[in-house]
Amino acid sequence: MRYYILLLTASLLAACSSTPDFNAPVDPDEVIATYVDIARASYGDSLITARELEASINRFLAQPSAAGLEQAKQAWLAARIPYQQTEAYRFGNSVVDEWEGRVNSWPLDEGLIDYTADSYGTQSDFNYFYSANVIANEILDAGGVVVDAAVISPQLLAEELHQLDGVEANVATGYHAIEFLLWGQDLHGTSPGNGERPWTDYSLDNCTNGNCDRRRQYLASATTLLVNDLEEMVQNWQEGGAAYTNLMAKGTQGGLATMLTGMGSLAYGELAGERIRLGLLLNDPEEEHDCFSDNTHNSHYYDAVGIRNVYMGEYRRVSGELVNGPSLSQLVIQEAPAVSAEMMARLEETEFAMTAMVAEASRGNTFDVLIGRDNTEGEAIVTRIVDALMEETRTIEKIINELALTNVNIEGSDSLDNPEVIF
């Protein structure tokens, strides 16, 4: 994954060579149009890479092998890069937020899906289906709820299993369900190492851990659903689509408010809080975002890049094409030059802090290692990211004030606002 980081860094430098004229007047409606263009491009890339993931998984299932499983894993990792850059569109856009749970829900109680180690346990006070293991069982019966799972299909996953019994941790679809099926559980705790699922879990001739036929069906179904869901979101951003229509209905001020809501909520409540600070407080690897693959460092990095994309009005496609146009950054420099300079400094500090985390991961010190108890160096690296994101959010709030925007609600997190309730 270091290749992708280096590619993106190079693209950011290249983008600087085509920096727009910041002295030219900027039409706020054109800024919103650029925001839409980037949504179309980044969700389009998410769909392209999901289709490549599907093709890789289909090849693996046709001829299971260790090499085939590794290729599928690499395709999954590549698919995460454009998708994570879309997450700044989640908050403030209700169409995206309501849809997002189908593709990126976490954390998940993986025992709903497949076999787990003894250390996982068999019961949860909050989830009757904590260890239901649908791959091994054609009928699920718990807490008065019965599910006929004789046929594993996209419909079963989407309509019956996902968030079964109203429990959010019953994640049956999306990137993280596929991640678990490719890697298996990460049993290394806060030590180096990720999931070690054998390729033979998908072999019909040399099946390990039983039910390989149903496991194959589940993996294929989950991947089909991911592609279908991303196709839906791509259409949502076309003219006349639900996300596009909702955004346009908000008007100019509402559109700008949506952009800043997405940036601030991702930076503060979601990324700094729920995805980073919470895991650090609990020293719990179960709180890391891509916990089976240990790809969390990259997911966090590209979330931060997504925030920058929205502000700078530019996005580098997987093809290498640069999508850009009139930007929020240009608008801010016109209205409040000092705040604009401050925001650029905040973005640079966040990128620097994130890059340090990625560098540690390349040495085997992935996010779950960094948040381990008594890892003072790891804590310092992660805390610097949290601090940078919090400062970034404070500057976003200044931008909101300078642009005289209203109805901007930046989401918080107990891990930042009320940490005492975590314990």
Predicted regions and their residues:
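Sec-dependent signal peptide recognition
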Residues: 2-7
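Mature extracytoplasmic or organellar-lumen-exposed domains after removal of signal/transit peptides
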Residues: 22-423
